[in-house]
Design a protein with these regions (language model features):
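Short helix-perturbing small/polar motifs within transmembrane alpha-helices
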Residues: 92-97, 103-148
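Membrane-interface interhelical loops and short interface/amphipathic helices
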Residues: 142-192
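Long, positively charged, glycine-interspersed low-complexity recognition regions
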Residues: 4-18, 28, 261-345
Length: 345
């Protein structure tokens, strides 16, 4: 009886027999490698060209292209993907928006490139992701601060004008109760505008990781989804949360700096709450995997956790407790903890 399965030599164990029939990864040939490099460079350039229009979504395409281009390659592939992405990003941004958005494009491209490179080369650590998000946040705020100061205004005035414009355009079709809610939302947006920058930066980081993971799968590189269950923030996040709470409590005792202290404390608490909520959801996913919960019910569980976080901050409380209690029994050297260790891929 004919069979399409390859012939396995005698004397192999069951484990080596499986590896002989279905290898974990396939090394590309010379022609296939060039094709993959060209495809990755083109996709990375396309994503970079539109980085100013949609920095979060474009980071998926950029990281995907970079992962495809440099997967299994060396310095030449990294240089080609980085230079092409930067050039395409600068040219595309200049043609669409002029020079104003070029610095933000460069930041998005560099972030997506570095995270994709770190993922493909198995160098990512959990702490590095948060450092990347914090760095991108500070750079974005710095860019807008310099830009507004060159125009004779401030970043606070810029945010206020944008919020007022959005509120004014939405006022016309609302009743009195809706207008009151909208004005309250305006006050919240004015107080938490730094958190908006952090949310955008975190979106760039997460989408870059997703693009790199998808690109690695496309190139038949060994990948794993265990990073979702191994997400573990550094202890300094809990310390920052405590500092933010302390700043909010000390605000009334510092009359000269009450408004600034309260604003800084509120934004530190909100940013760390977002990060801790992700850890709480990761604990939930880990627990559901241990219990072999079906995908449908796991999805409903995550959606419920998001709702409970928005209503009662429950997920962030679970994440904060996990930082101390280590429910998943993970190694506590978080800055050296790999999200996707090679031994588990």
């Amino acid at each position: 009886m004919n069979s399409k399965r390859p012939v396995v030599p005698e004397g192999l164990t069951s484990e080596t027999r499986q590896l002989a029939v279905r290898p974990e990864s396939v090394e590309p040939s010379g022609r296939g490698h060039r094709t993959r490099l060209i495809m990755g460079v083109v996709l990375g350039s396309i994503g970079s060209a539109y980085a100013a229009s949609a920095p979060v979504l474009s980071s998926v395409v950029i990281a995907f292209g970079v992962a495809v281009a440099i997967g299994g390659g060396g310095r030449l592939e990294r240089a080609a993907s980085l230079i092409s992405a930067l050039v395409a990003g600068v040219v595309g941004t200049y043609l669409l928006f002029g020079t104003y958005e070029i610095p933000m494009t460069v930041v998005s491209v560099l972030c997506a490139f570095l995270l994709a490179w770190g993922y493909v080369s198995d160098r990512l650590r959990t702490g590095w992701l948060l450092l990347a998000a914090a760095a991108v946040t500070c750079i974005m705020i710095g860019i807008d601060t310099v830009s507004t100061s060159m125009q004779g205004t401030s970043i606070t005035d810029l945010v206020a004008s944008m919020v007022d414009e959005a509120v004014t355009s939405s006022m016309g079709s609302l009743d009195m109760e809706g207008k009151a809610v909208l004005l309250e939302t305006r006050d919240q947006m004015m107080a938490y505008w730094p958190t908006v920058y952090f949310t955008v930066a975190l979106g760039i980081v997460v989408c870059s990781l997703f693009g790199a993971w998808t690109g690695a799968r496309t190139c038949m590189l060994p990948v794993s989804s265990d990073g979702v269950y191994r997400y573990d923030v550094p202890l300094c996040v809990a310390e920052l949360f405590a500092v933010g709470v302390a700043a909010q409590l000390l605000g009334p005792f510092l009359p000269a700096w009450q408004e600034e202290t309260a604003m800084v404390g509120a934004n530190v608490v909100m940013c760390t709450r977002i990060v801790l909520a992700q850890q709480g959801i990761s604990v939930l996913l880990w627990r559901m995997r241990e219990r072999r919960v079906a995908v449908l019910f796991a999805t409903l569980g995550v959606l419920s956790a998001v709702w409970l976080e928005m209503s009662f901050a429950l997920a962030s409380v679970v994440g904060l407790l996990d930082v101390v209690a280590n429910f998943r029994h993970l190694p506590r050297n978080r800055m050296d903890l790999r999200l996707w260790p090679a031994s588990e891929r």
